[in-house]
Amino acid sequence: DQMLLANMKRAGNVPTDVILFNIDSKASLDNLDGKDKILSVFEKVFNEKQGLSTIPHVAELERFLIKNNKYEEFKEAVSKECGEDWETARNDFYFRRDEIVNAYSKVMNKSQEEAENWFDKAEENYDISIEKFAKRIKEYIEANDKKHVVFLVDEVGQYAGTDSKALLNLQTMV
């Protein structure tokens, strides 16, 4: 069918970011039975794709800093405070509290108390939903010249298994 072939060629010419992963290998052990266990893995790999932290509330901080054109300045401030680059220090986020708080305070022109309060409540205040995640993907697409994003997920059926919450989570995302 010529129409089908033309559509396939047209689809093949659209710039696309492909995110290929095995869901089980990317899953966190702390969310194996949560209702959003599939969403959390998708969020993690999407953050990785953008060069952000795999820790959700840390990635949220990075998005905030990027949006406010403070990310590079923050990374430099963390490097001065920690003696290592941000990409390394963020993996030890909880052990680098004082250095990160100091850097955030300086870069965002916040008091030490405000920065400490932010740090101490960042994880607790972080919330993600499928709707928020979809908006993030939409923003990413719009910021990247309408480039498509395709998630190719291996072993998702086995990962969800007979967990009705996980299956509903997957169904809602798709």
What role is predicted for each listed range?
Residues 79-133:
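Long, low-complexity, polar/charged, intrinsically disordered or flexibly structured peripheral segments
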Residues 13-27, 113-118, 146-158:
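Glycine-rich, often proline-containing surface loops adjacent to acidic residues and nearby aromatics
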Residues 72, 107-111, 144:
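Short, flexible helical or helix-coil boundary motifs
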Residues 55-61, 118-122, 152:
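Short coil/turn segments at secondary-structure boundaries
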Residues 1-92:
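P-loop NTPase motor core
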Residues 50-54, 112, 145:
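Residue-level signal for secondary-structure boundary elements
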Residues 125-174:
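Conserved Walker B catalytic segment
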Residues 27-31, 107-111, 157-161, 167-168:
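Flexible loop/turn segments at secondary-structure boundaries
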